[in-house]
Amino acid sequence: MKKQYRIAVLPGDGIGPEVMKEAYKILKILQNYFSLHIEIKEFNIGGIALDKEGVALPKDTLLGCENSDAILFGSVGGKKWNNLPIEKRPERASLLPLRKHFNLFYNLRPAKLYSELRFLSPLRSKTXIKNGFDILCIRELTGGIYFGEPRGRLKKNNIEYAFDTEVYYDYEINRIAHVAFQLARTRKNKVCSIDKANVLNSSLLWREIVTKVSKNYPDVHLSHLYIDNATMQIIQNPNQFDILLCSNLFGDILSDECAIITGSIGMLPSASLNEKNFGLYEPAGGSAPDIAGKNIANPIAQILSLSMLVRYGMNLKKIANKIDQSVISVLKKGYRTFDISDDNNXFLKTNEMGDVIADALINGE
């Protein structure tokens, strides 16, 4: 008997509902053409949930996610809710509690530059990226300086000061290191661990444990870079990297650097997962309220987020590869949305891009 997959779909705010409609087209193809048994249930999240139910993360949404195998997330937030206290705004009051509730301790951020879109990259003149690049940034999500205690802001002798604490426990580093090495075996068998071990004790522990874990993966090549050198090396030659293994803070920095050198954040998916392989899959960009409702948003990041769900959440790598290949196929044919077009007078609308990707998937292109 074939497994039935349950997906909680959370379109959210801004362009979220628009691009999610295009992901639905791919989901229907998975059901009808690939004979996957997928149960889809949609729930409110973020600003729309605040407006309708008074909270950004309603109880029925959380329960729906608990009863699912994965979460397909759109985007949350917008100017409409910026007058609220920061802790009640959609971004803070929905996405962060979801991550905490499900203990989503690591984030996968692919940064892929397609050769057809090289003209978008700030590094387009570099010969080293003429064929594009493909980096996977693995970021620890639940430890480090964003969560360490003590933290605060105080005043002493009329002098104000603030402090945060970088804390990492050995088990936190150990588990994400295993994730990185296991994923490296599905790619190019290369891991570059990022730290500041020449200055920080937390980074020294990070390097020691990552090195120790690497002994279990003799087929995977491990290298180490200090964060300051890594930021330069990525700009100099991104092709030298495959997997970047990062702490929370360093991963926050490097994943955005990797994103911007691809030229369009509208192309980039992401996934946050826990030890049971339960994950939340979402575009790396935001809700983009300035273009919401105009049918010009790029749906590719949302579609590729679904592909990541199929790859990591369902463990159906061959089908995920076919979704990825469909995106590559339409790019090779010259199809573009506004954000990735070099001709502002010739680009596809959001729904049109979804249609051509769906057709490519059906036709096996």
Swiss-Prot record:
Coiled coil: none
This protein's UniProt keywords: Amino-acid biosynthesis, Branched-chain amino acid biosynthesis, Cytoplasm, Leucine biosynthesis, Magnesium, Manganese, Metal-binding, NAD, Oxidoreductase, Plasmid
UniProt-annotated location(s): Cytoplasm
Site (Important for catalysis): residue numbering on this chain: 146, 196
Gene Ontology biological process terms, A to Z: L-leucine biosynthetic process
An annotated Gene Ontology molecular function: magnesium ion binding
Cofactor note: Binds 1 Mg(2+) or Mn(2+) ion per subunit.
Pfam family, one: Iso_dh
Signal peptide: none
Pathway where it operates: Amino-acid biosynthesis; L-leucine biosynthesis; L-leucine from 3-methyl-2-oxobutanoate: step 3/4
Binding locations of Mg(2+): 228, 252, 256
GO CC annotation, single: cytosol
Record HAMAP family: LeuB_type1
The family this protein is said to belong to: Belongs to the isocitrate and isopropylmalate dehydrogenases family. LeuB type 1 subfamily.
Assembly: Homodimer.
Protein name per the record: 3-isopropylmalate dehydrogenase
Organism: Buchnera aphidicola subsp. Macrosiphoniella ludovicianae
Gene field: leuB
